[in-house]
């Protein structure tokens, strides 16, 4: 599986983005429905706004797709991402786009609107799952039901773009679905062994997974939302979070290892002093070495080790 990482040389100011997209919009109708590879095999140009979606596209489409991932760096804060000229170019040329929605990757909507194409199929995961626009947690890939739905939708879209390979894409989606079984088993085992395990977090990056395993997140939603949105939590919220560690009310502390600041460092220090294991969750799929399935299994096993053996995992 090969997924191209799109890295812009520099952030593109809003005005310049509009100018570039205006040019792209004129050129867009000339893009062919399929791209020829060096071997002569025609491949569909596809884009995943996030690396995890690009990875799933690649698994479904196999040799018939050329996939690019936009947000793909597990060492940066995805909330600070800015589109570069290269990003606009790649998205404008795509025939299939998978994006998260819920405002997480709104730059994609701007690019698509400025470079419309009747050939492009856009899968907005928020809309695919029927979620309202005011849904509070955009980290949809941690929800076990998300990627099977994405895989089916990707297979259908690819089948429309290349009808001759529709059966191949359907088989890819079915294989992907089966490959999630070890993760779902790990979730079920964790839920059965540690029902309602009390945990604390910095933000909701892994909240869907915590819900799936039946854990009780005692961190106030206000603190999670403030941290996610780059807002300083109130002193009352911080004091309550501190008490979760000092009074040993939680068994694990989970934090977003891509977004750490002095407050996160303070929580980590408190957890360590009180003997509470910590788990660093990734907001972006770590690469190389992982696909979506192995990433989710690794995160789930990190939580299991923390609960069962009091072992911390801060890096995959």
Task: Label each region the model flagged.
Residues 7, 14-17, 39, 171:
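Feature targets compositionally biased, intrinsically disordered low-complexity regions
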Residues 15-29:
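Bacterial N-terminal signal peptides
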């Amino acid at each position: 599986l090969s997924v191209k990482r799109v890295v812009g040389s520099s952030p593109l100011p809003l005005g310049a983005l509009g100018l570039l997209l205006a040019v792209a919009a004129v050129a867009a109708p000339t893009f062919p429905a399929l791209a020829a590879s060096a071997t002569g095999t025609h491949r569909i140009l596809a884009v995943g706004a996030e690396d995890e979606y690009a990875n799933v596209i690649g698994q479904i489409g196999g040799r018939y797709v050329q996939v690019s991932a936009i947000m793909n760096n597990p060492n940066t804060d995805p909330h600070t991402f800015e589109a570069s000229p290269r990003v606009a170019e790649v998205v404008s040329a795509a025939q299939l786009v998978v994006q998260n929605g819920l405002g997480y990757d709104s730059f994609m909507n701007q690019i698509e609107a400025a470079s419309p194409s009747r050939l492009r199929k856009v899968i907005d995961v928020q809309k695919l799952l029927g979620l309202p626009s005011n849904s509070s947690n955009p980290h949809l890939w941690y929800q076990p039901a998300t990627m099977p739905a994405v895989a089916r939708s990707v297979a259908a879209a690819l089948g429309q773009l290349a009808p001759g390979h529709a059966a191949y894409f359907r088989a890819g989606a079915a294989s992907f679905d089966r490959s999630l079984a070890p993760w779902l088993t790990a979730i079920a085992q964790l839920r059965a062994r540690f029902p309602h395990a009390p945990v604390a977090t910095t933000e909701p990056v892994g909240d869907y997974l915590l819900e799936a395993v039946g854990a009780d997140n005692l961190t106030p939603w206000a603190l999670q939302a403030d941290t996610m949105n780059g807002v300083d939590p109130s002193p009352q919220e911080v004091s309550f979070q501190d008490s979760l560690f000092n009074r040993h009310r939680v068994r694990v502390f989970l934090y977003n290892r891509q977004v750490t600041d002095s407050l996160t460092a303070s929580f980590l220090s408190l957890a360590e002093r009180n003997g509470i294991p910590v788990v660093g969750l990734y907001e972006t799929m770590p690469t190389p070495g992982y696909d979506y399935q192995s990433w989710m299994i690794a995160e789930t096993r990190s939580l299991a080790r923390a609960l069962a053996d009091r072992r911390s995992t801060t890096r995959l």
